[in-house]
From Swiss-Prot:
Coiled coil: none annotated. PLA2 catalyzes the calcium-dependent hydrolysis of the 2-acyl groups in 3-sn-phosphoglycerides. The active site is at H74, D124. Disulfide bonds join C55-C71, C70-C130, C77-C123, C86-C116, C109-C121. Expressed by the venom gland. Belongs to the phospholipase A2 family. Ca(2+) binds at H54, G56, G58, D75. This is Phospholipase A2 Scol/Pla. It catalyses: a 1,2-diacyl-sn-glycero-3-phosphocholine + H2O = a 1-acyl-sn-glycero-3-phosphocholine + a fatty acid + H(+). CDD domains: PLA2c (cd00125). Its EC number is 3.1.1.4.
Amino acid sequence: MSSKIPLLFIISFGLYVSTTNSSPIERRSLWNFFFMTFIGGKRAPWKYDGYGNHCGIGGKGSPVDSIDRCCQVHDRCYHEVNENECGSYKRNVKFIDYDWYMQDKQIVCDTTDTVCAQAICKCDKDIVECLNQNDKDYNPKYNKAIG
């Protein structure tokens, strides 16, 4: 499995670069979230996929710990943004572009984006910060993808 991770990253990065024609960190929300976690987070993004009951696709039940709670809050944030700030869009917030950058080791959402894009960026920024703050609680036994 460990040899697949670098290959997965290389393929993901290649797709990331090849699917963009804009500034270095302007991508569709899922790519933004992946790279925001990769660059601004304490753990690789794939360490959270399948973690607990809420990290990754779907989400149900009670969070198993504070890491899983971060993912639950993120899911709710996306839902709220999809209903409110992005309600006029006819697509899921996971596929709306936004801009962000790092400044003094902090994630900054671009204020020139639409209200919708800024709200999505804030959801992603908040989860990365939440995951970082609760990193001590990360327990590999809760990761269904690797455990």
